[in-house]
C-alpha cells in the first residue's frame, strides 16, 4: 500500500508541470495575488484597490480620510471632487475642520444630489462662517476649449483632486476614485506627491476653479500655463487643447528589450488615442488594454490603417481607473514611465471637463507599482461578451 502511494505521488509530481502548461494562460494569471494596499518611497505614495481579491476593497477610498485625520490648526486642505456620497471621509474632513484646519471645497453640482454631499456642503459653511468654504460649479468650473455642444454626460467638474498642507508637508494628490460607494467595487488608484512647486501649481489651479475663471490676481492662464514641469514630473490641467496622454503616446517607440505599453482607462473614446495605441502595436510594442465596457473593447479591437491591437490583449473588467504604465523608449531613450489622473480618454475629458493628469518619467519603483496594479486587473478581466460596435463621434 505504501509503495503504491509513493508511486502515485511520484507520478502526480511529474505530471503537475505538464498539467500547468495545458492550463489556459488567463486562468494562471488570475491565480496571482491581487494588488491592494499603499506603498511610499521618496516623497511619493501610491494606493491601489483589487476588488476581485478583496471584497469591497476600501484602500483608495479610506486613504483621504486617514490623511484628513492628521490635520489640525494651521493646516489647509483643498478638495475638488466630482461625486461624494459616503460617510467616512465626510466625518473625517468635518472633524479636521473642527480641530482648526482650513478646509476648502470645489464640487460639481452632483454633490447636492445625496445626503452626504448636502451634509458636507452645509456643515463646512456652518463650522467656518467667516470664509467662503464651498464653491459648487454647474457644469465645468473653467471655460471650455471648444465651441460645443459638449458630448453627452460631459461638461462637468470631474476632479478627484486634493492639495494639502499638513504638518508642513505640501502635497499634490490625485485619484481615479470619486468618494462614492460604487467605487469600492471598482479598480482604482491614488497618487500623492510631496513637492512644494507642484503643490503651488495645484493651489493656483484650485483658486481658478473657485473663481470659475482663468484670471486670478490679474494673471490669466492660457493652455501653456496649465502645464507644470519639475524634474521628471509633469502635471497638466484641463480643459486644454493639448493632452498629456496623447503627447506621451506620440513620443513612445519600442525596442526588443523595452516594449511594454499597458493602459487601463475606464473609457476610451478618442480616435487619436486609439490610433497611437494601434501604431505602437504595429511597430512591435506589446500593447495591453483594460477598459470597463465591452463596447469600448470592440471599438479598440478594430483593425486600423495605423495598426491592429490583438483582440486577446484588449479586455474588460469593472474598473474606474485612468493609468498608463510604460517600459519603452520615450523621446528616444529607454525608460519607465507612468501617466495617471482623473481623465478618461474622451472629448469631454479633454475640452469640456475640469481634469488633472500627471506623468512621472524614470521612476522604476513607481512604474513597478502601477504595472502590478494593471497586471492584477488584466489577469481578472475577460473578453467582451457583446459584439455591439459603438459610434465614437470626433471631438469638436
Predicted regions and their residues:
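Short, glycine-rich nucleotide/cofactor-binding loops
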Residues: 79-85, 265-269
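Terminal interaction modules at protein C-ends
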Residues: 258-274, 286-299, 368-371, 375, ...
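Secretory targeting and sorting signals
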Residues: 1-29
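HKD-type phospholipase D/PLD-like phosphodiesterase module
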Residues: 31-75, 83-254, 290-337, 341-363, ...
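Beta-propeller domains
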Residues: 230-285
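Short, well-ordered loop/turn and helix-capping segments at boundaries between secondary-structure elements
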Residues: 20, 24, 362, 366, ...
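Hydrophobic alpha-helix feature that most strongly marks membrane-spanning transmembrane helices
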Residues: 282, 328, 343, 375, ...
Amino acid at each position: 500500500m505504501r509503495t503504491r502511494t509513493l508511486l502515485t505521488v511520484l507520478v502526480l509530481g511529474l505530471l503537475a508541470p505538464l498539467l500547468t502548461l495545458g492550463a489556459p494562460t488567463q486562468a494562471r494569471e488570475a491565480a496571482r495575488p491581487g494588488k491592494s494596499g499603499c506603498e511610499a518611497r521618496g516623497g511619493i505614495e501610491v494606493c491601489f484597490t483589487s476588488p476581485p481579491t478583496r471584497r469591497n476593497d476600501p484602500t483608495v477610498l479610506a486613504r483621504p480620510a486617514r490623511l484628513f485625520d492628521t490635520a489640525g490648526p494651521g493646516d489647509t486642505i483643498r478638495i475638488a471632487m466630482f461625486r461624494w456620497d459616503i460617510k467616512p471621509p465626510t466625518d473625517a474632513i468635518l472633524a479636521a475642520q473642527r480641530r482648526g484646519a482650513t478646509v476648502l471645497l470645489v464640487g460639481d453640482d452632483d454633490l447636492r444630489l445625496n445626503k452626504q454631499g448636502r451634509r458636507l456642503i452645509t456643515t463646512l459653511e456652518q463650522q467656518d462662517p467667516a470664509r467662503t468654504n464651498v464653491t459648487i460649479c454647474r457644469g465645468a468650473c473653467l471655460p471650455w476649449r471648444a465651441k460645443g455642444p459638449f458630448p453627452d454626460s460631459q461638461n462637468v467638474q470631474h476632479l478627484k483632486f486634493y492639495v494639502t498642507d499638513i504638518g508642513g508637508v505640501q502635497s499634490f494628490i490625485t485619484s481615479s476614485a470619486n468618494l462614492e460607494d460604487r467605487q469600492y467595487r471598482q479598480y482604482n488608484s491614488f497618487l500623492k506627491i510631496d513637492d512644494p512647486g507642484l503643490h503651488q501649481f495645484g493651489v493656483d489651479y484650485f483658486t481658478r476653479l473657485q473663481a470659475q475663471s482663468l484670471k486670478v490676481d490679474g494673471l490669466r492662464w492660457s493652455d501653456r500655463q496649465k502645464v507644470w514641469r519639475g524634474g521628471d514630473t509633469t502635471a497638466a490641467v484641463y480643459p486644454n487643447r493639448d493632452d498629456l496622454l496623447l503627447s506621451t503616446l506620440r513620443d513612445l517607440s519600442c525596442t526588443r528589450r523595452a516594449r511594454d505599453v499597458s493602459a487601463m482607462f475606464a473609457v476610451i473614446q478618442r480616435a487619436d488615442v486609439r490610433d497611437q495605441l494601434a501604431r505602437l502595436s504595429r511597430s512591435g510594442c506589446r500593447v495591453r488594454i483594460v477598459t470597463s465596457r465591452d463596447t469600448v473593447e470592440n471599438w479598440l479591437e478594430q483593425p486600423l490603417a495605423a495598426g491592429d491591437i490583438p483582440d486577446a490583449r484588449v479586455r474588460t473588467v469593472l474598473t474606474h481607473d485612468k493609468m498608463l504604465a510604460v517600459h519603452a523608449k520615450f523621446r528616444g531613450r529607454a525608460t519607465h514611465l507612468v501617466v495617471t489622473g482623473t481623465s478618461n480618454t474622451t472629448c469631454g475629458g479633454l475640452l469640456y471637463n475640469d481634469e488633472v493628469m500627471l506623468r512621472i518619467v524614470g521612476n522604476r519603483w513607481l512604474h513597478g507599482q502601477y504595472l502590478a496594479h494593471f497586471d492584477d486587473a488584466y489577469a481578472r478581466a475577460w473578453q467582451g461578451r457583446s459584439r455591439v460596435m459603438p459610434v465614437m463621434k470626433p471631438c469638436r
